[in-house]
């Protein structure tokens, strides 16, 4: 039985959507009702084409009133969203931020996260996110994952520090062997 697992999920893409129409635009992309989505909240969404066919199923993170990230497996959603926004006349900027994502999953992930960020990380609810710092590096941490266990995604905002973050988390997990 595994106790925790750290995965480099750099293959994941982040699509950043900002601008005055960002909230209206992300609602246009998915049939899921986002009207009550708060800043700091994450939602599992389905992106559909004009016929209702599923294009992708990312996690949507709301970082500000008009600031969103789509966190998805590799695909061309960035280009698709740019084309949809242009064609539909939305006032948004769509880009791919320089992010290095890691997943820390498993029953002991909470203890490891507390050793890294302190006890307040335990207050991060399922499918919520918050900006944090670790060793001078800016991260976005979400309580999401695929393991059916307690888990977190750590999205390092500057990919050049990815190896250092990975090693820091590995060291933090050693006492829990």
Region spans (language model):
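Basic, glycine/lysine-rich polyanion-binding surfaces/domains
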Residues: 3-177
């Amino acid at each position: 039985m595994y106790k925790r697992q750290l995965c480099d999920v750099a293959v994941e893409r982040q699509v950043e959507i900002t601008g005055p129409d960002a909230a209206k635009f992300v609602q246009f992309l998915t049939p899921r009702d986002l009207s009550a989505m708060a800043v700091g909240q994450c939602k599992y969404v389905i992106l559909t084409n004009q016929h209702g066919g599923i294009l992708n199923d990312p996690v949507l993170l709301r970082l500000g009133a008009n600031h969103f990230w789509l966190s998805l497996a590799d695909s061309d959603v960035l280009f698709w969203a740019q084309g949809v926004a242009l064609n539909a006349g939305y006032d948004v900027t769509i880009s791919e931020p320089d992010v290095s994502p890691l997943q820390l999953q498993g029953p002991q992930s909470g203890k490891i996260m507390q050793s890294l960020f302190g006890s307040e990380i335990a207050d991060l609810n399922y499918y919520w996110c918050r900006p944090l710092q670790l060793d001078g590096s800016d991260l976005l941490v979400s309580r999401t994952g695929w393991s059916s266990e307690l888990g977190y995604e750590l999205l390092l905002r500057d990919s050049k520090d990815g190896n250092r973050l990975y090693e820091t988390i590995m060291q933090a997990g050693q006492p829990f062997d």
